[in-house]
Amino acid sequence: MKIIRVQDQLEGGKVAFSLLKESLAEGATTLGLATGSTPITFYQELVNSDLDCSALTSINLDEYVGLPVENDQSYDYFMRDQLFNAKPFKESFLPNGLADDLEAEVKRYDQVIAEHPIDFQILGIGRNGHIGFNEPGTPFAEKTHVVDLQASTIEANSRFFASIDDVPKQAISMGIASIMASKMIVLLAFGKEKAAAIKGMVSGPVTEALPASVLQQHDHVVVIVDEAAASELD
């Protein structure tokens, strides 16, 4: 696990984008993508570059259950707004949170991942150590699954909604085993509220109580942190 300390989120996005360009030069064709505020500067770098994404495939980590894609808090909307409208990919996959049969959708998404192995996976990290929507206690062997979101996650995401009651209570998430199958993982974390999770991920025991700690067992992880997020590291 390589730690890169940066001044701020802007620099973090630039560093992540430079790592992406290196991976693409080495033949990467499938990107695993994340949502939320953390990767926005990475997407800005991508959008402002001359990179042609028309031969690339993207697979997103997760999607809320029950939000229409035209809702501006759906991850489908987020990805179009932040990246895909400006940089179309050959194929872009997201879980379908409106599927009538969620278990069938989970199986479909696992098949998508199996057919398009991820070369370069972007991650954020939750305050409770979640990656994707894999909450504490999620088995490391889990593949794509339907998640009941923890109260802390619902509260953290409530700032994006008119009321906490509007925050979806479930999501479909790529599983920890799916994430770990990625060839390279780049995890971004900014802000003091991520410091404890970063410390546990980097130097704590590998435990399902802190999902991100499993990344200690991956061969190619780069962690990009600002000073606040790195403040509890030695």
Curated annotation (Swiss-Prot):
Gene Ontology cellular-component terms listed: cytoplasm
Catalytic activity: alpha-D-glucosamine 6-phosphate + H2O = beta-D-fructose 6-phosphate + NH4(+)
Pfam families per record: Glucosamine_iso
Keywords, ordered alphabetically: Carbohydrate metabolism, Hydrolase
GO BP field: carbohydrate metabolic process; glucosamine catabolic process; N-acetylglucosamine catabolic process; N-acetylneuraminate catabolic process
Biological or metabolic pathway of the protein: Amino-sugar metabolism; N-acetylneuraminate degradation; D-fructose 6-phosphate from N-acetylneuraminate: step 5/5
GO molecular function: glucosamine-6-phosphate deaminase activity; identical protein binding
EC numbers, comma separated: 3.5.99.6
Catalytic residues identified in the record: D62, N128, H130, E135
EC top class named in words: hydrolase
InterPro entries linked: Glc/Gal-6P_isomerase, Glucosamine6P_isomerase, Glucosamine6P_isomerase_CS, NagB/RpiA_transferase-like
Role of this protein: Catalyzes the reversible isomerization-deamination of glucosamine 6-phosphate (GlcN6P) to form fructose 6-phosphate (Fru6P) and ammonium ion.
PANTHER family to which the protein is assigned, alphabetical: GLUCOSAMINE-6-PHOSPHATE ISOMERASE (PTHR11280:SF5)
Membership in a protein family: Belongs to the glucosamine/galactosamine-6-phosphate isomerase family. NagB subfamily.
Protein name: Glucosamine-6-phosphate deaminase
